[in-house]
Amino acid sequence: MELLKLNRSVQGTGPGPGASLCRPGAPLLNSSSVGNLSCEPPRIRGAGTRELELAIRITLYAVIFLMSVGGNMLIIVVLGLSRRLRTVTNAFLLSLAVSDLLLAVACMPFTLLPNLMGTFIFGTVICKAVSYLMGVSVSVSTLSLVAIALERYSAICRPLQARVWQTRSHAARVIVATWLLSGLLMVPYPVYTVVQPVGPRVLQCVHRWPSARVRQTWSVLLLLLLFFIPGVVMAVAYGLISRELYLGLRFDGDSDSDSQSRVRNQGGLPGAVHQNGRCRPETGAVGEDSDGCYVQLPRSRPALELTALTAPGPGSGSRPTQAKLLAKKRVVRMLLVIVVLFFLCWLPVYSANTWRAFDGPGAHRALSGAPISFIHLLSYASACVNPLVYCFMHRRFRQACLETCARCCPRPPRARPRALPDEDPPTPSIASLSRLSYTTISTLGPG
């Protein structure tokens, strides 16, 4: 993907991930992870207005940069240190965090500093390297989102087939292929990136394409490969996941109602119900971090349920179902947020790039100045919203984050308070109740 270049005075250049530098005093514009930083002489406005816009943009740059670097570094550290989080999905999240961190580190400083200094001082090698890394980081981020969508679709909607190939070694191969494919796709950027003078002691890092047709073809190719096709795949995958989860909601409600009716009419014990081979969530996967529903095979001698130790009261069998319903609703909401944020962050940039490739003057008149700058800032924001959506809404990640912080900053042990005389005695643990259940079944003998 590439960003809009609005400087019409440089012939033969086009949008791309490099940072094309501004003339001194021009308003702050920026490039996204794959676009040029472009500047245009400021419109006739008051000095106070220009200074206010510049201050707002610099502040937004700083906030997004700190959130992107801090959030993605935290993800990398927590996922790397926590053994419990070394799963297939988290392997893709780790790759996504690395690509987002690369996007923030390799793009934003080389966008902001040349705007403030008025010229590109880093040389041709840095210009080509930054251009290439910007493109690779955005490509890896997009492909990682697609891989996560397909992995979750397989885990939830095709659980039996997914268990065969969903291993960490397979995820590692997919991640390596994602980085290699992105690296090959972005080879044209360093090839056609140059540093050229645009005025006395003013340099720009720009892309000089062979022709306008090549620039248009490249813009359409990136629009299809890195936005339209991934967006469709993600929308379809998460749509099918949402459909499966909502069907599971209705199935759980119907099956629990039937189970409670049998308990009331027959005096029996509620058991695990499976109708028509439809998948239901794994036992114990009631939390918000459950990421799949798997078919449970019936046991020959099911153990006595813990609820059988007490008489079934009104609503006692509905609590697990309510917990599962709430967990599934949270998953559906998170999936919708993922798709909406993806389109929200990248649709304006891709639309502007395509518009610029086919109608440069019209795009220049409409988007030069503050509009294109904030469009690019919106694309930068994707690097800091991904950690929030994928990890900070994950209960186990929050727990692992707290454990990591406690490990790095240990606190002195506190004295345990003594129990007061009027406190309730400790309740028996689940393990002791389980032993009681097993002993009861053993004494009763096989049914």
Curated annotation (Swiss-Prot):
Lipidated residue numbers (S-palmitoyl cysteine): C408
Region span, Disordered: 258-285
Pfam families: 7tm_1 (PF00001)
Glycosylation, residue list: N7, N30, N36
Tissue: Isoform 1 is expressed in brain, pancreas, stomach, the colon cancer cell line LoVo and the T-lymphoblastoma Jurkat, but not in heart, placenta, liver, lung, skeletal muscle, kidney or the stomach cancer cell line AGS. Expressed at high levels in the small cell lung cancer cell line NCI-H510, at lower levels in NCI-H345, NCI-H69 and GLC-28 cell lines, not expressed in GLC-19 cell line. Within the stomach, expressed at high levels in the mucosa of the gastric fundus and at low levels in the antrum and duodenum.
Disulfide bridges in this chain: C127-C205
Cytoplasmic side: 80-87, 151-170, 243-333, 395-447
Segments crossing the lipid bilayer: 58-79, 88-109, 132-150, 171-189, 220-242, 334-355, 374-394
GO biological process: cell surface receptor signaling pathway; cholecystokinin signaling pathway; digestive tract development; gastric acid secretion; gland development; neuropeptide signaling pathway; pH reduction; phospholipase C-activating G protein-coupled receptor signaling pathway
Location relative to the cell: Cell membrane
Extracellular side: 1-57, 110-131, 190-219, 356-373
UniProt keywords, alphabetically: Cell membrane, Disulfide bond, G-protein coupled receptor, Glycoprotein, Lipoprotein, Membrane, Palmitate, Receptor, Transducer, Transmembrane, Transmembrane helix
CC per GO annotation: intracellular membrane-bounded organelle; plasma membrane
Record's bilayer topology term: Multi-pass membrane protein
Record-level Gene Ontology MF annotations: 1-phosphatidylinositol-3-kinase regulator activity; cholecystokinin receptor activity; gastrin receptor activity; neuropeptide receptor activity; peptide hormone binding; type B gastrin/cholecystokinin receptor binding
Family: Belongs to the G-protein coupled receptor 1 family.
Physiological role: Receptor for gastrin and cholecystokinin. The CCK-B receptors occur throughout the central nervous system where they modulate anxiety, analgesia, arousal, and neuroleptic activity. This receptor mediates its action by association with G proteins that activate a phosphatidylinositol-calcium second messenger system. Isoform 2 is constitutively activated and may regulate cancer cell proliferation via a gastrin-independent mechanism.
Name of the featured protein: Gastrin/cholecystokinin type B receptor
Organism in which the protein naturally occurs: Homo sapiens (Human)
